């Protein structure tokens, strides 16, 4: 019995530690500029670090967020990402940025960021935004209509979306609490996986006719 209790305590402690570490680790140096060259590099947060003495201002700089992204696509939106791949100096700093452009009635379809909370500010247009809470919270929808200057937060891991409900283009900027937040677009992931998920599984899960699922998989096929 004593061994059993000890095992339970060890297991619980391991779980607590794992959850506590489930974010970008804090840096143990002033900065760690990501570099592709393995020579004299130190591997941190999935990137090799440049020798700090060789770091320069360009490692912490990006230009171009003043330019609108192309929204000529099926969802009528475009996300311009500025993360560690664009700014190597973001490595280990736990933050990134995106610009989102929406054509009239365009949307950033339901998706989730597995590694980051997102805070979005609308600078132009009118958006309807929201996120859905987890199963244990009965999948509640939290949604608002945003006007320029309004801010909305999407908690880490929650499925969320933005829709331009105006007749003019909309522009938003968002900060994310990870150097590389990751993105999982729900429709693309479920109906466009490689290889595809068995249509019978999705038909039962979504309570759809299997032929409807097959049609959706054909539309989202990579």
Swiss-Prot record:
Cellular localization per UniProt: Secreted, Extracellular space, Apoplast
Signal peptide stretch: 1-22
Membrane found in the keyword field: no
PROSITE patterns documented for this protein: GERMIN
Disulfide partners: 32-49
Sample GO molecular function, one term: manganese ion binding
Keywords tagged on the record: Apoplast, Disulfide bond, Glycoprotein, Manganese, Metal-binding, Secreted, Signal
Gene Ontology cellular-component annotations: apoplast
Pfam families: Cupin_1 (PF00190)
Tagged with keyword Transport: no
Predominant location: secreted
Glycosylation sites: 78
Function: May play a role in plant defense. Probably has no oxalate oxidase activity even if the active site is conserved.
PANTHER family xrefs: GERMIN-LIKE PROTEIN SUBFAMILY 3 MEMBER 3
Family per similarity comment: Belongs to the germin family.
Record-given protein name: Germin-like protein subfamily 1 member 14
Organism: Arabidopsis thaliana (Mouse-ear cress)
């Amino acid at each position: 019995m004593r061994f059993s209790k000890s095992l339970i305590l060890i297991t619980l402690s391991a779980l607590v530690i794992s959850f506590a570490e489930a974010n970008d680790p804090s840096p143990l140096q002033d900065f760690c500029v990501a570099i592709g060259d393995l020579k004299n590099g130190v591997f941190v947060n999935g990137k090799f670090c440049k020798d700090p003495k060789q770091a320069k201002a360009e490692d912490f700089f990006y230009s171009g967020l003043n330019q609108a992204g192309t929204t000529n696509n099926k969802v009528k939106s475009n996300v311009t990402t500025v993360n560690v791949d664009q700014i190597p100096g973001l490595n280990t700093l736990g933050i990134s940025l995106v610009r989102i452009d929406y054509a009239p009635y365009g949307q950033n379809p339901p998706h989730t960021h597995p590694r980051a909370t997102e805070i979005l500010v609308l600078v132009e247009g009118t958006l309807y935004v929201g996120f859905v809470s987890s199963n244990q919270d009965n999948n509640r929808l939290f949604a608002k209509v945003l006007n320029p200057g309004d801010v909305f937060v999407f908690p880490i891991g929650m499925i969320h979306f933005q829709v331009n409900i105006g007749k003019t283009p909309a522009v938003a900027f968002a900060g994310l609490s990870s150097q590389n937040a990751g993105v999982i677009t729900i429709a693309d992931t479920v109906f466009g996986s490689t290889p595809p998920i068995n249509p019978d599984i999705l038909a039962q899960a979504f309570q759809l006719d299997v032929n409807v699922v097959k049609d959706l998989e054909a539309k989202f096929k990579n």
